[in-house]
């Protein structure tokens, strides 16, 4: 991405929701590299898909020659951002937040280049400047510059104040001041002149711009990326099992890959613009090819490959594709023990069983069948496979060789109904 028209290119991809003084920012970018930042609060032990667009936006700026600062909120994570939240957040302990800070910092690291000369990325933690600040300094040096009248009129806060059942604590109300001071600190320390974030962060970003101007007399800018929505109106980044996480221990690479494979046709080309580094021309060509092929579109597979490789690397992608292919073909010989562990984590329904169980009981316990009687009929009709092999004997008891790696047996009813037995 060329730096001179970077904002225009981001807009073409649908990646700009709001921007302050767009003309002045474009001029500043045209003058040469800048430093910019995006903040990630440790509200859990992993980032999720909602964090991916701003994180990739940092990467896009770095590829254009700019210096990204990834700020993990060791201090703000102790307070909690009230922006557009229906209720007060639960406060986590300092030990928990510090543990999450470490995990998120490691998670962010692979997306950015921390060793590439002038525009090497920087990892920062706002606990470094808030940890030892006393309340008098906070009120005199920061609080003095904020108008309560303006703060309560910010949309993110106003929504909470207007709810009869929920007010807002002073703790969460002060969050806006903390994030504003982050921008001022990073401007002074690293020359940061741009903050990016989700569109729900607009109020916090503009507060930081105003505070930086008051404290340092510097012009700085803000840019928000849109909160991603799906064409059918349902929430993006959620499955029946909850959020889709970037940590492979919370969402396996296989499950992550499948999430993208299941993208609706109405969303897929837009998501390619948001979540990949393919050019607009390549995405448009793929859309045209899919439209004229008369076959199932390729776009979902391209999207799943690109994003899974970005988040989980080549090894994670190949494991996800291998598991997908084996489940589709019914042949499990290519699967490793680690692949089965992914399936047990969240890939297919899983049931734990004691050794010595029979097939009918396994079908009932796994909820592949409602009763032993129904299980008997289904087995006899040749609709059950064990590790890809048909089994039509209703009196079948599992053998040692059915336990792959001594631990796993994969049952299938029909073509698509799976359950993984994990032997105790």
UniProtKB/Swiss-Prot annotation:
Magnesium is essential for activity. Inhibited by chloride and sulfate in the presence of 1 mM free Mg(2+). When the Mg(2+) concentration increases to 10 mM there is almost no chloride inhibition any more. Inhibited by diphosphate and AMP. Chloride strengthens the diphosphate inhibition and weakens the AMP inhibition. Chloride weakens the binding of Mg(2+) to the RNA and thereby the interaction between the enzyme and the RNA. Acetylation at certain lysine residues could significantly impair activity. D-tyrosine is a competitive inhibitor of L-tyrosine for the formation of tyrosyl-tRNA(Tyr). It is an enzyme of class 6 (ligase). Changing residue 37 to V: Confers specificity for the non-natural amino acid 3-iodo-tyrosine. It catalyses: tRNA(Tyr) + L-tyrosine + ATP = L-tyrosyl-tRNA(Tyr) + AMP + diphosphate + H(+); D-tyrosine + tRNA(Tyr) + ATP = D-tyrosyl-tRNA(Tyr) + AMP + diphosphate + H(+). L-tyrosine binds at residues 37, 175, 179. Coiled coil: none annotated. A motif ('HIGH' region) lies at residues 42-51. It is found in: Cytoplasm. One of its GO terms (molecular function) is protein homodimerization activity. The keyword ATP-binding applies. Acetylated at Lys-144. Acetylation at Lys-144 leads to slightly decreased activity. In vitro, in the presence of acetyl-phosphate, can also be acetylated at Lys-67, Lys-85, Lys-90, Lys-230, Lys-235, Lys-238, Lys-321 and Lys-377. Acetylation at Lys-85, Lys-235 or Lys-238 causes dramatic decrease in activity. Catalyzes the attachment of L-tyrosine to tRNA(Tyr) in a two-step reaction: tyrosine is first activated by ATP to form Tyr-AMP and then transferred to the acceptor end of tRNA(Tyr). Can also mischarge tRNA(Tyr) with D-tyrosine, leading to the formation of D-tyrosyl-tRNA(Tyr), which can be hydrolyzed by the D-aminoacyl-tRNA deacylase. In vitro, can also use the non-natural amino acid azatyrosine. This is Tyrosine--tRNA ligase. It comes from Escherichia coli (strain K12). The lineage of its organism: Bacteria, Pseudomonadati, Pseudomonadota, Gammaproteobacteria, Enterobacterales. The gene is tyrS.
């Amino acid at each position: 991405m060329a730096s001179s028209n970077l904002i225009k290119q981001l807009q073409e991809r649908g990646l700009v929701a709001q921007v302050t003084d767009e003309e002045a920012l474009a001029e500043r970018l045209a003058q040469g590299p800048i430093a910019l930042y995006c903040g990630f609060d440790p509200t859990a032990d992993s980032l999720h898909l909602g964090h991916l667009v701003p994180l990739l936006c940092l990467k896009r700026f770095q590829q254009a020659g700019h210096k990204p600062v990834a700020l993990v909120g060791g201090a703000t994570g102790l307070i909690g951002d009230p922006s557009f939240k229906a209720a007060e957040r639960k406060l986590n302990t300092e030990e928990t937040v510090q543990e999450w800070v470490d995990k998120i910092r490691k998670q962010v690291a692979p997306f950015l280049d921390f060793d590439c000369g002038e525009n090497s990325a920087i990892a920062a933690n706002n606990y470094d400047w808030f940890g030892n600040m006393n309340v008098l300094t906070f009120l005199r040096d920061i609080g003095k510059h904020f108008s309560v009248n303006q703060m309560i009129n910010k949309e993110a806060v106003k929504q909470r104040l207007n709810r009869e059942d929920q007010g807002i604590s002073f703790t969460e109300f002060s969050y806006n001041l903390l994030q504003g001071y982050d921008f001022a600190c990073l401007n002074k320390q690293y020359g940061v002149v741009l903050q990016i974030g989700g569109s729900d962060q607009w109020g916090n970003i503009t507060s930081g711009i105003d505070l930086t101007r008051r404290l340092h007399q510097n012009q700085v800018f803000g840019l928000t990326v849109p909160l991603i929505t799906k064409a059918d109106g349902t929430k993006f980044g959620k499955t029946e099992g909850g959020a889709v996480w970037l940590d492979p221990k919370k969402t396996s690479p296989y499950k992550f890959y499948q999430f993208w494979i299941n993208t609706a046709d109405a969303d897929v080309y837009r998501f390619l613009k948001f979540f990949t580094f393919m050019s607009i021309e390549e995405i448009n060509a793929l859309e045209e090819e899919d439209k004229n092929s008369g076959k199932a579109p390729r776009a979902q597979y391209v999207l799943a490959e690109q994003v899974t490789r970005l988040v989980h690397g080549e090894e994670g992608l190949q494991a996800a594709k291998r598991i997908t292919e084996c489940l589709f073909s019914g042949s499990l010989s290519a699967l490793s023990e680690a692949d089965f562990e992914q399936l047990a984590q969240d890939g297919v329904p899983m049931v734990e069983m004691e050794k010595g169980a029979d097939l009918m009981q396994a079908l009932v316990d796994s909820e592949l069948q409602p009763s032993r009687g129904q299980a008997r009929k289904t087995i006899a009709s040749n609709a059950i496979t064990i590790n890809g092999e048909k089994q039509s004997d209703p009196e079948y008891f599992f053998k040692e060789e059915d336990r792959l790696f001594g631990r796993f047996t994969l049952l299938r009813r029909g073509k698509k109904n799976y359950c993984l037995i994990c032997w105790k």
